[in-house]
Amino acid sequence: DKDGNKKDSFEPGIELNGKITVFAEGCRGHLGKELIKKFNLDEGKDPQQYGIGFKEIWEITEDKHEEGMVIHTAGWPLDNSTYGGSFVYHAENKQIFLGYVIGLDYKNPYLSPFDEFQRFKTHPTIKKIIDGGKRISYGARALIEGGFQSLPKMYMPGALLIGCDAGTLNMPKIKGSHTAMKSGMIAAETIMENLKENKSLSSYEDKFKKSWIYKELYAARNVKPSFSW
């Protein structure tokens, strides 16, 4: 009840025990952010940054469909002081993935990210693509955008952070599935070495820094900060 007393319908939560736990909750995971705070994993790092992304799947007319076509834009309808951009991916079966991302550090308190996305679709280039088409799916999600400068320490006693729990999204590409999967593979290798040879979990971060993920995020490190200069 409201006072914390167990009611007749109370059922205790499931207790999961493991020697090593991998946290892969995605952007701003509830447990991940608690662990980062508890173990001070972000000490000496830039504050993490976030955005909100909208995505729609459209079925368009055959004459406008160009399978494999990719469009990325920055700016309009946002002003020069607000970070954001769009993507249009022409998939198969006359479908496109259309989306817009806006950084949640925007200064205008009256800005509505959803409304800006709707306004974006009135741009002549985009309107021409979706005219006569049909929206068949839509959604929204938070994105982690701090990038290289905000990567926390990724290991702690008995646990590892992977994917967006660790902030591995490549912000300019608006892409994080590939880095999440690779970080999971590195975590698996680290766990096997720990269980077989009792190696320290700190080797996870060493392996991460030697991988292509680290190089990719380093190459993109100045894109997001450049919008604040």
Residue spans of the language-model regions?
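Predominantly flavin-linked oxidoreductase catalytic cores and closely associated redox partners
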Residues: D1-K128, I186, T190
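Flexible loop/turn segments at secondary-structure boundaries
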Residues: G29-L31, D105-K107, G147-S150, T168-N170, ...
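Flexible, glycine/charged-enriched surface loops at secondary-structure junctions
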Residues: K128-G139, K196-S203
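Short, conserved secondary-structure transition motifs
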Residues: E56-T61, Y138-A142, D206-K215
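Conserved alpha/beta core surface patches that mediate binding of polyanionic ligands
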Residues: H72-G84, G139-P152
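Alpha-helix capping and helix-loop boundary segments enriched in small/acidic/polar residues
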Residues: K45, N108, S150-K153, M171-T179, ...
